């Protein structure tokens, strides 16, 4: 990996009388430079020879719409620190530190830290890295707030999903609106990331690889049992209920079929429902016995908590205690950004990490994105959740954190969490076929509507799809025993999505030997093929229109293809693997296709060129593709 830092002193005189200097850094893909005479920064794609020079590094907009520009600050100090250039800007009312960083050998970032001087000061908005006519036709790729900016060969995205991204008529910027004063002793900080892509067909893959490189926990399957719709469904459950399920999973799955189960996640039903997130009567001594058994099975314990208090009657009970404990609420739900509620929630979850050794969290209900609670240090519940997630990672960097309702398809969530919700209902039905087939179509239609179309650069490998469902307290027919073929379709289509959050909402007694075998085989296959499935992306059409759709993932040595026909009629699909696998220019586009699940005579065993295939009604297929020698 190339790391170069140069410092050339320029014999120039600037207003403060010091000699000006130019600083430069580069890695394998990006060069950074800063000229302190003009406060000019250049971020350059060295492969495409394309520079981005902002009009200025930043500017502040005050409540009266007065703007404080970078040029209104004095440069107090500049220095290099390893792979970074640190610039301190000062003026009587604000100090701003800007840090230009090389990241992971091929990316770059700019950190901004803003502090008030002397007293708290109101700032309406901070704008970062505004550019004009630095790229031909920049755009924001996605309808979701903070979706990446694409500027020629660059992608640019914020580290926080509360930051807006903007591109219009060759101008771009990132900006954030502040609802609380900037403090002298508690600066606000934001980061802007820069990456490059070699050609248009590689944009999604390049963003995906960048996210996996910088996220706190790299992609890795997290297979686990979830108690929801099994032993718990808006009802408390007992320690013995949990221990009993663990024995069943061990017998049939862990010891029985040699499948590693990463965790047993206890969903709603464990707490005392006071909103304080304390143990309920059934777990008055904590999770000690559950954890001991999990340890003996080489597994761990995961836990559900809901920042806004949960759902239905349990939520109402928790919220009813809010006044008693001084907890803040918004729209009839507990408010994470409330000072007292945040303090309690944060303290309890850190205790669960440190004292109970909880290894994963399902945080269900992130709250409001826009409402500010008077007296809160946070602009919104979203803002509070970012602080919470940071604190959780500090307590244990290896946590798996799943954020459910309240999030959206901004890739920036993945700088804090491991997965987010696909949107929509937990389970529902759509289209023809049995309830299982209708559930699969609904699951994937919602994913297409809310993620693929609105956030096309969000990695499908980091979605919560609501798992594999075959549980006695499920509904819409999923509480009934499924046919072996329906269950297999559900299982294989689920693992073909490439998601690392692998949830099993399953009542063990509802599975026979064939189903256990199917589940074990598919789970092992997904773990063994994680290095390929990390690239999973959407192919085909819209499940809502009952069009053939699926998932594809590619690496140089192997690729994976999953296809499904959601219609009750046969349908054709134009199989163009160069397009479906998003193969880079010059890459091998001929493959040996091996069926992993299902069989279809219209799919060629030796793929040479694009071909029309026919999928039977409600057919699910999964293939491995090995490049031709």
Feature map (PLM): residue ranges:
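Acidic-aromatic substrate-binding/catalytic surfaces of carbohydrate-active enzymes
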Residues: 22-86
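Sec-dependent N-terminal signal peptides
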Residues: 4-13
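Active-site groove signature of glycoside hydrolases
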Residues: 258-270, 345-375
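The substrate-binding groove and active-site-proximal loops of carbohydrate-active enzymes
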Residues: 224-243, 270-285, 327-344, 367-382, ...
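Conserved structural scaffold segments of CAZyme catalytic domains across common CAZy folds
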Residues: 84, 90-93, 104-109, 114-316, ...
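Aromatic- and acidic-residue-enriched segments that line the glycan-binding/catalytic groove
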Residues: 275-285, 309-330, 414-426
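Active-site-proximal substrate-binding groove within the catalytic cores of carbohydrate-active enzymes
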Residues: 185-186, 385-600, 612-625
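Active-site-adjacent "subsite" loops/lids of carbohydrate-active enzymes
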Residues: 231-236, 300-356, 367
């Amino acid at each position: 990996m190339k790391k170069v830092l140069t410092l050339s002193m320029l014999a120039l005189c600037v207003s403060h009388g010091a000699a000006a200097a130019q600083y430069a850094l580069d890695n394998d893909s990006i060069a950074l430079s800063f000229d302190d005479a003009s406060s000019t920064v250049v971020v350059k794609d060295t492969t495409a020879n394309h520079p981005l020079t902002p009009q200025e590094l930043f500017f502040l907009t005050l409540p009266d719409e007065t703007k404080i520009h970078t040029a209104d600050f004095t440069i107090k100090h500049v220095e290099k620190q390893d792979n970074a250039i640190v610039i301190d800007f000062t003026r009587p009312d604000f100090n701003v530190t800007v840090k230009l960083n090389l990241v992971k050998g091929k990316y770059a970032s700019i950190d901004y830290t803003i502090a008030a001087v002397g007293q708290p000061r109101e700032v309406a908005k901070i704008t970062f890295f505004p550019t004009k006519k630095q790229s031909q036709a920049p755009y924001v790729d996605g309808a979701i707030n903070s979706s990446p900016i694409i500027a020629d060969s660059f992608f640019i995205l914020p580290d926080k999903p509360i930051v807006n991204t903007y591109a219009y008529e060759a101008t771009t910027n990132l900006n954030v609106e502040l609802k609380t004063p900037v403090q002298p002793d508690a600066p606000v900080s934001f980061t802007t990331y820069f990456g490059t892509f070699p050609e248009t067909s590689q944009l999604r893959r390049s963003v995906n690889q960048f996210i996996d490189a910088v996220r706190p926990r790299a992609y890795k399957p997290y297979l686990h049992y979830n108690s929801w719709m099994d032993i718990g469904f808006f009802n408390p459950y007992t320690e013995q209920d949990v221990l009993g399920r663990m024995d069943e999973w061990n017998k049939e799955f862990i010891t029985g079929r040699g499948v590693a189960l990463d965790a047993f996640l206890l969903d709603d039903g464990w707490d005392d429902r006071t909103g304080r997130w304390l143990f309920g009567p059934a777990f008055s001594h904590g999770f000690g016995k559950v954890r001991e058994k999990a340890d003996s099975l080489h597994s761990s314990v995961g836990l559900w908590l809901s920042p806004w208090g949960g759902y239905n009657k349990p939520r109402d009970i928790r919220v009813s205690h809010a006044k008693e404990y001084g907890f803040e609420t918004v729209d009839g739900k507990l408010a994470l950004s409330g000072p007292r509620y945040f303090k309690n929630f944060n303290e309890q979850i850190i205790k669960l990490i440190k004292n109970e050794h909880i290894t994963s969290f399902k945080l269900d209900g992130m709250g409001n994105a826009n409402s500010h609670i008077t007296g809160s240090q946070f602009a919104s519940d979203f803002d509070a959740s970012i602080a919470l997630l940071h604190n959780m990672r500090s307590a244990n960097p290896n946590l798996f954190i799943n954020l459910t309702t309240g999030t959206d398809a901004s890739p920036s969530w993945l700088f804090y969490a491991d997965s987010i919700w696909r949107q929509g209902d937990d389970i529902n039905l759509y289209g023809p076929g049995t309830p299982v087939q209708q559930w699969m179509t609904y699951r994937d239609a919602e994913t297409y509507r809310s993620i693929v179309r609105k956030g096309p650069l969000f990695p499908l490998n980091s979605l919560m799809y609501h798992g594999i469902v075959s549980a006695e307290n499920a509904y819409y027919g999923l509480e009934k025993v499924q046919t072996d073929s329906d269950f297999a379709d559900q299982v294989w289509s689920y693992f073909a999505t490439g998601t690392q959050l692998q949830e099993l909402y399953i009542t063990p007694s509802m599975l026979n030997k064939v189903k256990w075998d199917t589940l074990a085989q598919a789970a092992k296959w997904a773990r063994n093929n994680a290095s390929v499935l990390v690239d999973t992306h959407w192919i085909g059409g819209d499940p809502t229109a009952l069009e053939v759709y699926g998932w594809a993932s590619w690496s140089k040595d192997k690729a994976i293809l999953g296809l499904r026909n959601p219609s009750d009629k046969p349908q054709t699909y134009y199989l163009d693997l160069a397009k479906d696998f998003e193969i880079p220019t010059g890459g091998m586009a001929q493959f040996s296709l091996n069926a992993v699940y299902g069989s279809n005579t219209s799919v060629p065993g030796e793929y040479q060129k694009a071909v029309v295939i026919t999928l039977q009604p409600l057919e699910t297929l999964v293939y491995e593709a090995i490049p031709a020698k």
